[in-house]
From Swiss-Prot:
The lineage of its organism: Eukaryota, Metazoa, Chordata, Craniata, Vertebrata. InterPro entries: Paralemmin. One of its GO terms (cellular component) is membrane. This is Palmdelphin. The modification Phosphoserine is found at S135, S321, S370, S384, S385, S498, S515, S520. Residues 248-259, 484-495 have a biased composition (Basic and acidic residues). It comes from Homo sapiens. The keyword Transmembrane helix does not apply. The keyword Coiled coil applies. It holds the Pfam family Paralemmin. Phosphorylated. There is a cross-link at K125, K179 (Glycyl lysine isopeptide (Lys-Gly) (interchain with G-Cter in SUMO2)). Keywords: Acetylation, Cell projection, Coiled coil, Cytoplasm, Isopeptide bond, Phosphoprotein, Synapse, Ubl conjugation.
Length: 551
């Protein structure tokens, strides 16, 4: 109770002291204002006195004197108020001093009466022990046949609590011996070494310099005896700094050398790539085509075959030839492949390559013949250049081994027909053409859909695009209903008519090569070697598809 009253008296003294300080500050401000007014009135009175000496009229002198008297009166009032305020300030300062003295006395009493946390804990223990309660032993004494060694659970719990609360019986979980060197000039402590000790073997020898309930620090001299007298206690900051230095010293370990990470081989699973068939680079160098004496249309076909894809365009027709290039020995080896009529919106696949390109002046596409009309042989033209002849002599191809390495020999090969030449059998050529039995089997494969075919037929015109300007134009005849290809007669005039019906057979072409020139409208369109102009052959094929006949 006494402590509470002292605390209350101290708080009241602090409050009174604060009020007095505020009054003193206000009075000092008032004094400053009065002093400024006093100085202003003094200056005004001196100026009026100086002006009064130069005035000769009586009325003005009387007015100036009255004003001067009023100013002098105000000056006296201000001087008195300033003196009074200064006296009040002195009284307030004395009262503040008395309150401060009283506050200091109360604070001293509080320090003498105030108890620490340890004192409070001890007093609570003493009160618990002094409290009059019935003994537990008396309760269990009435129980018969109870062994003397039996300890009630409540009593055992109290004993355990006393052991835990007792500071002397506390066990250290971790102990460490730290050697510290202290600089007496700067006061800095340096950790020399730190040795962990077993907590069971640790003995609190030395002088306790720090204890916060969780950590205890004992000062021991170098000979493991108590430190010299006059050892001061350590501050929490110093203890934390020592523990930090000790932990850093323990964490330091010798450098372990190992192979760098980048020295180990790195194995990364390869990403499977999609198989795409694209024409290889330098296609014309890899596949050397020996052709001499062919027409302009054939040369354009060879050029376009090396450049990539080309599209034959007619009126409302798109012809796309997916024919991969194939090398051949010394002579032009070709296979004409019949293509289907497809809609205009059909896209070209990446593997498709064309063998011919439509001539700007020609009214029809380049010629394409049946695989049955494919021929192979030796090509030697009389007007061929010396360079081509040297290449023919140096380069000897085998038709089987001249294929690209990525093509299987067992799979069928697509060949392109480029024209006819006279071929002569010789023993020398047969030696180089080992593995070639003289026969190449070719077949015409047509893949179509009946629905697409019907749609395509609906879009096809019944006459050739340039037929009105041609000499062989005839009006279209009404066509019967479409039937299946297997049931249609080869001689019927339908859109499914074979395109090779009106083409020249091998025997007829051989006869035309040896026969004299006939005077026909199309004889002028022949090449220098006697073969038929490819544009005329293409016109024949186109007219054959449309059911017309070229004379």
């Amino acid at each position: 109770m006494e402590e509470a009253e002292l605390v209350k008296g101290r708080l009241q003294a602090i409050t009174d002291k604060r009020k007095i300080q505020e009054e003193i500050s206000q009075k000092r401000l008032k004094i400053e204002e009065d002093k400024l007014k006093h100085q202003h009135l003094k200056k005004k009175a001196l100026r009026e006195k100086w002006l009064l000496d130069g005035i000769s009229s009586g009325k003005e002198q009387e007015e100036m004197k009255k004003q001067n008297q009023q100013d002098q009166h105000q000056i006296q009032v201000l001087e008195q108020s300033i003196l009074r305020l200064e006296k009040e300030i002195q009284d307030l300062e004395k009262a503040e001093l008395q309150i401060s003295t009283k506050e200091e006395a109360i604070l001293k009493k509080l320090k003498s009466i105030e108890r620490t946390t340890e004192d409070i804990i001890r007093s609570v223990k003493v009160e618990r022990e002094e409290r009059a309660e019935e003994s537990i032993e008396d309760i269990y004494a009435n129980i018969p046949d109870l062994p003397k060694s039996y300890i009630p659970s409540r009593l055992r719990k109290e004993i355990n609590e006393e052991k835990e609360d007792d500071e002397q019986n506390r066990k250290a979980l971790y102990a460490m011996e730290i050697k510290v060197e202290k600089d007496l000039k700067t006061g800095e402590s340096t950790v020399l070494s730190s040795i962990p000790l077993p907590s069971d073997d640790f003995k609190g020898t030395g002088i306790k310099v720090y204890d916060d309930g969780q950590k205890s620090v004992y000062a021991v001299s170098s000979n493991h005896s108590a430190a010299y007298n006059g050892t001061d206690g350590l501050a929490p900051v110093e203890v934390e700094e020592l523990l930090r230095q000790a932990s850093e010293r323990n964490s330091k370990s010798p450098t372990e050398y190992h192979e760098p990470v980048y020295a180990n081989p790195f194995y990364r699973p390869t990403t499977p790539q999609r198989e795409t068939v694209t024409p290889g680079p330098n296609f014309q160098e890899r596949i050397k085509i020996k052709t001499n004496g062919l027409g302009i249309g054939v040369n354009e076909s060879i050029h376009n075959m090396g450049n990539g894809l080309s599209e034959e365009r007619g009126n409302n027709f798109n012809h796309i030839s997916p024919i991969p290039p194939v090398p051949h020995p010394r002579s032009v080896i070709q296979q004409a492949e019949e293509k289907l009529h497809t809609p205009q919106k059909r896209l070209m696949t990446p593997w498709e390559e064309s063998n011919v390109m439509q001539d700007k002046d020609a009214p029809s596409p380049k010629p394409r013949l049946s695989p049955r009309e494919t021929i192979f042989g030796k090509s030697e033209h009389q007007n061929s250049s010396p360079t081509c002849q040297e290449d023919e002599e140096d380069v000897r191809y085998n038709i089987v081994h001249s294929l690209p390495p990525d093509i299987n020999d067992t799979e069928p090969v697509t060949m392109i027909f480029m024209g006819y030449q006279q071929a002569e059998d010789s023993e020398e050529d047969k030696k180089f053409l080992t593995g070639y039995d003289g026969i190449i089997h070719a077949e015409l494969v047509v893949i179509d859909d009946e629905e697409e075919e019907d749609e395509g037929e609906a879009e096809k015109p019944s006459y050739h695009p340039i037929a009105p300007h041609s000499q062989v134009y005839q009006p279209a005849k009404p066509t019967p209903l479409p039937r299946k290809r297997s049931e249609a007669s080869p001689h019927e005039n339908t859109n499914h008519k074979s395109p090779h019906k009106n083409s020249i057979s091998l025997k007829e072409q051989e006869e035309s090569l040896g026969s004299p020139v006939h005077h026909s409208p199309f004889d002028a369109q022949t090449t220098g070697d006697g073969t038929e102009d490819p544009s005329l052959t293409a016109l024949r094929m186109r007219m054959a598809k449309l059911g017309k006949k070229v004379i």
